[in-house]
Curated annotation (Swiss-Prot):
Species for this entry: Candida albicans
Entry EC no(s): 3.4.23.24
Keyword Repeat: no
Highest rank taxon of the organism: Eukaryota
A cellular-component GO term for this protein: side of membrane
Residue ranges the record marks as coiled coil: none
Primary location group: membrane
Quaternary structure (record): Monomer.
Name of the protein in question: Secreted aspartic protease 9
Record key words, sorted: Aspartyl protease, Cell membrane, Cell wall, Disulfide bond, Glycoprotein, GPI-anchor, Hydrolase, Lipoprotein, Membrane, Protease, Secreted, Signal, Virulence, Zymogen
UniProt region (Disordered), positions on chain: 31-50, 500-520
């Protein structure tokens, strides 16, 4: 049987659509919170100085990565914050109620140690029941009354991270100990909060929206901002790819100003407190056959860039140098047999001196959470002291950070971080120096709380690496980044990464591999089905 050209073209198109790379270009925005995002043309990290050049309070201007979604048959446009440290998508309802965070909380956005999401006693008790009494679903009156008593007794507050989930995974709080790290406040600036300035979704105008008959959606942050609403599912278009029946939440009341696209592990979905998980965006992309594996690669770009990208189901070999090295994510909780957050082992950290020698500031395996939602990085006290000493910095109690020589902003020295798998990422010290005033510079590495079991690397470290997140196999692959606008993209099959060699350099990108097929200018696609169908199509045209 002979196929005509139209049929063959249709097969080619179908093959490409089924397993083609799915790329989201995001814009970089800065702000103290999601209520205080920077103007469109301002993507540089910002800090607020008060009360003198040294005796000052610095307000962390966080980093946000914003993507555009079109939701429902009405294609309501929403700009949301991409977050690798949370796992739920939620957007604003068209008629939601905008509320303000308490003034006392808004005034505490500093470098103080935040605990992330604040859970009340009722929620803490529920998490213990989920772990040890999975069949029990009814709360006692005593448990309900307990929520009135806890407030901030167990958990402090602060707005140093931008991850915004309410759950830490099943059993996370079985010992009622505060866990400090990836999570943080969402914002809430007061009466000027319009809530819908970055878009909203009108469920009544979408013919394809279905409301879930489940518990309400609820997220609460350490700075007392929150969002509550309903769960549902609808068609969501991202970068010209439509995901059918994607589960997400619609907020009816919030003190935040923008929704969130969480793409983390399913163990961090807010529904885990109700003993179930669902297919968030990475998992749904795989389930629908849009990508072959729940995997994405992240390119944060340079410190002053206004845009970056995330590539689902594929790797851009032009964006890194050398080889990708894969490390297993670490288990977060002893009670859980799998990781619930993206945490990897770091073996050692060295600081390069001006003479070329190195000073070791960390040795021995230490868990580190990779959180692109955090502008700054947070390490343990002894590591921070060693880093400050190596850079001849002076610790300022009033600032809560090391004051360093501003000449380091132009330094070519690096901090060398060896991850598990013997992969070393070189981080320019200049990326870790923040200008607080004309004559004062701050080290953008802060002290992690002593109650935390892990350190945290934010985007000032992570932008030096090209990182591939494999949610199926709980793996992370890393390589030294190569900053370039060129692309050499390979689709990843169900078996995972097969080609781990980068074609990028510090000045230019490389070329394609011999097994790749040219798909479009500047893009390399490795897809056997596409190659076979394209060969059939070429043969057909030759024969006729």
């Amino acid at each position: 049987m002979r196929l005509n050209s139209v049929a063959l073209l249709s097969l080619v198109a179908t093959a490409l659509a089924a397993k083609a790379p799915f790329k989201i270009d995001f814009e970089v925005r800065r702000g103290e919170s999601k209520d205080d995002l920077s103007p469109e043309d301002d993507s540089n990290p910002r800090f607020v100085k008060r009360d003198g050049s040294l005796d000052m309070t610095l307000t962390n201007k966080q980093t946000f990565y914003m993507a555009t979604l079109k939701i429902g048959s009405n294609e309501d446009e929403n700009r949301v914050l991409e977050d690798t440290g949370s796992s739920d998508l939620w957007v604003m309802s068209h008629d939601l109620k905008c509320v303000s965070a308490p003034i006392s909380k808004r005034n505490e956005r500093s470098f103080g140690h935040g605990t992330g999401v604040k859970l009340n006693e009722r929620e803490l008790m529920q998490k213990r029941k989920n772990l040890y009494q999975p069949s029990r679903t009814i709360e006692t009156d005593e448990e309900k009354e307990a929520s009135e008593k806890i407030h901030n007794k167990l958990f402090g507050f602060g707005s140093i991270y931008s991850t915004v989930y309410i759950t830490e995974g099943p059993g996370a709080y079985s010992t009622f100990s505060p866990l400090v790290g990836t999570e943080g406040g969402s914002g809430g600036s007061g009466g000027s909060n319009t809530c819908r300035s970055y878009g909203s979704f009108n469920t009544e105008n979408s013919d394809t929206f279905k409301k879930n008959n489940t518990n309400d959606f609820e997220i609460q942050y350490a700075d007392d901002t929150s969002a509550i609403g309903i769960w549902g599912y609808d068609d969501v278009t991202i970068s010209n790819v439509t995901v059918k029946d994607l589960s997400f939440a619609i907020a009816n009341e919030t003190s935040s100003d923008v929704g969130v696209l969480g793409i983390g592990l399913p163990g961090l979905e807010v529904t885990t407190q109700l003993r179930y998980t669902y297919q968030n965006l990475p998992l749904k992309l795989k389930a629908d056959g849009i990508i072959a594996k729940s995997l994405y690669s992240l390119y944060l770009n340079t410190a002053d860039a206004k845009a970056g990208s995330i590539l689902f189901g594929a790797i851009d070999h032009a964006k890194y140098q050398g080889d990708l090295v894969t490390v297993k994510m670490m288990r977060t909780y002893s009670q859980i047999s799998y990781p619930v957050r993206i945490q990897v082992p770091v073996l050692k950290i060295d600081v390069e001196s001006s003479s070329g020698s190195t000073t070791n500031i960390l040795s021995g395996t230490t868990g580190v959470v990779l959180d692109t939602g955090s502008t700054l990085s947070y390490v343990f006290s002894d590591t921070l002291q060693s880093l400050g000493k190596a850079l001849n910095g002076q610790y300022s109690n009033s600032v809560g950070a090391y004051v360093v020589n501003c000449n380091l902003a132009d330094s070519s020295r690096t901090v060398d971080i060896e991850f598990g798998g013997n992969k070393t990422i070189k981080v320019p010290i200049s990326d870790l120096v923040l200008q607080a005033s004309k004559s004062t510079c701050i080290l953008g590495v802060m002290q992690q709380s002593s109650s935390s079991s892990y350190m945290l690397f934010g985007d000032n470290i992570l932008r030096s690496a090209y990182i591939v997140y494999d949610l199926d196999d709980y793996e992370v692959s890393l390589a030294q980044v190569s900053y370039t606008n060129k692309e050499s993209i390979e689709v990843i099959g169900a078996s995972g990464i097969t080609n781990s060699s980068g074609s990028g350099t510090t000045s230019s990108s490389g070329t394609s591999t011999s097994t790749s097929t040219r798909h479009s200018a500047g893009s390399i696609i490795s897809n056997p089905v596409y190659g076979l169908l394209l060969s059939l199509l070429i043969s057909y045209y030759v024969l006729v």
